[in-house]
Swiss-Prot record:
Entry-linked InterPro entries: Ribosomal_protein_uL29 (IPR050063), Ribosomal_uL29 (IPR001854), Ribosomal_uL29_sf (IPR036049)
Gene name tied to this protein: rpmC
Coiled-coil regions, chain positions: none
Protein name: Large ribosomal subunit protein uL29
Keyword terms, alphabetized: Ribonucleoprotein, Ribosomal protein
Domain of life: Bacteria
Family membership noted in the UniProt record: Belongs to the universal ribosomal protein uL29 family.
A Gene Ontology cellular-component term: cytosolic large ribosomal subunit
Molecular functions per Gene Ontology: structural constituent of ribosome
């Protein structure tokens, strides 16, 4: 998912997306540990998606704090 797509979402939608990505990451890690994962690159993709979502959440929080001050 692109950061530009994430910036159009609300904070609540981003938090839900983050929860889903963390669940997917956990599932992929378990599959990797039990050697059931065929596409190992999925682990890195999910990790980068989590980083994107967290970055956009931080941007929104910073913007909200700046507008309040």
């Amino acid at each position: 998912m692109k950061a530009s797509e994430l910036r159009n979402k609300t904070v609540e939608e981003l938090n839900n997306e983050l929860i889903e990505l963390r669940r997917a990451q956990f599932s992929l890690r378990m599959q990797l540990a039990t050697q059931q994962l065929n596409k190992v690159d999925q682990v890195g993709k999910v990790r980068r998606d989590i980083a994107r979502v967290r970055s956009v959440l931080a941007e929104k929080a910073k913007a909200a704090n700046a507008s309040q001050a």
